[in-house]
Curated annotation (Swiss-Prot):
Keywords: ATP-binding, Ligase, Nucleotide-binding. NCBIfam families: gshA_cyan_rel, PRK13517.1-1. This is Putative glutamate--cysteine ligase 2. GO terms for molecular function: ATP binding; glutamate-cysteine ligase activity; ligase activity, forming carbon-nitrogen bonds. Pfam families: GCS2. It comes from Rhodopirellula baltica (strain DSM 10527 / NCIMB 13988 / SH1). PANTHER family: GLUTAMATE--CYSTEINE LIGASE 2-RELATED (PTHR36510:SF1). It catalyses: L-cysteine + L-glutamate + ATP = gamma-L-glutamyl-L-cysteine + ADP + phosphate + H(+). Its EC number is 6.3.2.2. One of its GO terms (biological process) is modified amino acid biosynthetic process.
């Protein structure tokens, strides 16, 4: 196999929390005002953005040519955000949900798109206090992008399991490793993408969704893997935001290698193993429910296997691509940590009282936290 190493980018959505109680607080305007006053985010190699609610804030990295650049962007941006948040009596927390009772008086970000979403989707939009991690991999050719998307669907269950970081919701243990997934699944355009025969087939689907009023335009597709309209990339959206920088770095490297593998398989004409949509949907739900703590469904073989074995199948498949990047070590460290000590959801459940859980997440959000 021969590989080209594509550029990548990453987005992380963070919680803004009260330093005493750990509860979400709507201080995004104040934090962004402080960042602008201090000269903006250019030196952090990222863009800082609003999200749906004012207790959320998002970073989007510049285009990165290496995992070292990803690490630098995440580290510098988190430090900048933490400093700006603390100057406004706020802490930054990186996890898929906040464990404490959800806000009853949270302010919506004043943006036409967000207001339209809330007007249409009502309570599921008002309750959308969830925080994800999105990875972009360069993809100039959208026809190729469709086939890569088809080939990457098989990995969605294990990607869901390894990034699970949201066991608590509204003050209770939900029983899920990723309850964020279940909250997000309520949205009609969320979930795994279908298999598309071609770019024309994909575009026909988009046209049908617009025609029937399901979406305003293509940018309202929120599938777990999608082709964004603004940038020439393929975007992976299934993950909870992870707490430690090194987890995100390893995950970005994993996604890049998955895309490289899919491109190589497409160029070789390797047949795609058909996956039934119902099997894939169940496999993803099962991964969100149990994380790495139970057996998972391999959607290609339709067999239930240990989670560690499904992760091993992924690592074996992408090994040639990882070696081609020269940056296998962060990905291998991430995989080893998952086997040794579990996911972010597992760490949260070992954290004791919910206020202590938030405090631990806040502490690990600081870029100095290392894998252990």
């Amino acid at each position: 196999m021969s590989f080209q190493v594509p550029t990548v980018g990453v987005e992380e959505e963070y919680q803004l929390v009260d330093p005493r109680s750990g509860a979400l607080i709507p201080n995004c305007k104040e934090v962004m005002r402080t960042i602008r006053r201090n000269g903006g985010s250019e030196e952090a190699h990222s863009e800082i953005q609003h999200e749906l609610h004012l207790n959320q804030i998002e970073m989007a990295s510049d285009v990165c040519s290496s995992l070292e650049e990803v690490r630098d962007a995440l580290t510098q941006t988190r430090r900048m955000l933490i400093d700006a948040a603390r100057s406004n009596e706020t802490e930054l927390a990186s996890a898929g949900t906040n464990p404490l009772p959800i806000p009853t008086d949270d302010a919506l970000t004043p943006k036409d798109r967000y207001q339209a979403m809330t007007d249409r989707y009502q309570q599921i939009a008002r309750d959308l206090f969830i925080f994800g991690c999105h990875v972009h991999v360069a993809m100039e050719d959208r026809e190729l992008g469709i086939q890569v998307m088809n080939r990457c669907r098989r990995w969605l269950p294990i990607l869901q399991a390894i990034t699970a970081n949201s066991p608590y919701w509204d003050g209770v243990d939900t029983g899920y490793a990723s309850y964020r997934r279940e909250l997000w699944a309520q949205w009609p355009m969320a979930g795994p993408p279908a298999h598309f025969d071609s770019l024309a087939d994909y575009q026909s689907c988009v046209d049908d969704l617009v025609a029937c009023g399901a979406i305003k335009d293509e940018s309202f597709l929120y599938w777990d893997i999608r082709l964004p309209t603004r940038v020439p990339t393929i975007e992976f959206r299934a993950a909870d935001v992870m707490t430690r920088v090194e987890e995100t770095v390893g995950y970005v490297g994993m996604i890049r290698a998955i895309v490289m593998l899919a491109i190589s398989e497409e160029e070789q004409g390797k047949p795609i193993v058909p996956i039934r949509p119902s099997v894939l949907s169940y496999a993803i739900w099962h991964a969100a429910r149990y994380g790495m703590n139970e057996q998972l469904v391999d959607p290609e073989s339709r067999e239930m296997i240990p989670a560690s074995e499904l992760l091993n199948r992924l690592m074996t498949a992408i090994d040639p691509a990882l070696k081609a990047t020269g940056e296998a070590r962060p990905v291998e460290a991430f995989a080893n940590q998952l086997i040794k000590s579990g996911t972010g959801a597992d760490r949260q459940r070992r954290g004791g009282e919910l206020s202590s859980v938030v405090a631990n997440v806040v502490a690990e959000t600081v870029p100095s936290a290392i894998l252990a």
